[in-house]
Amino acid sequence: MNDKPQKRTKCDGEKISADSTVHADLEARMICIFGEITPASHLAMIDCLNRLSESDTDVTVYINSQGGNLTSALAIYDMFTHGRYPFKITTVATGQAFSAALIILQGGHERKMFRHAKLLLHRPRFTFSGGDSLDRGDLKYEDEMLQEFEKEICELLTEKTGKKIAAIYKDMATEKIFTAKEAIDYGLADEII
């Protein structure tokens, strides 16, 4: 008998594949995002939420992530806030919800943090690897994309926190880290657990 877990790219039964950032216990109505957020995380989240839609019992999403792909994080946020699910989603920062993970945290109907959890807000950035080369036209396009992401994040956080856009831009530029209490005071979380 082969005891090695099968690799899957979707929510299957009670667990997601070991190589995925997203893990789920469907019976407990719990999803965990632990690790880097990628397009595969978004696909796994879609599958999990669709499977959980068979019941109206609320779902808890635990987050411990250094961040990752901003497009995927915004897509997960949109699913949480605009998806037509028969349940409410509570998001919980368990260790760190940095960068793109902070955006996912904001998607919860209730946003909670463990007492020692931290959040990180910073300006969006692109990471280049594998010897990618850019010319001036590419740089102009990348700069426009970063500006658009920055605007979207500021608008989203203004809506969630009630802060003025200028204050959010300023805090993004300084790479602000929030303790759980500071996150509550800022409006990024609702409760410390």
Regions found by a protein language model. Name each.
Residues 1-193:
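Terminal-region recognition feature
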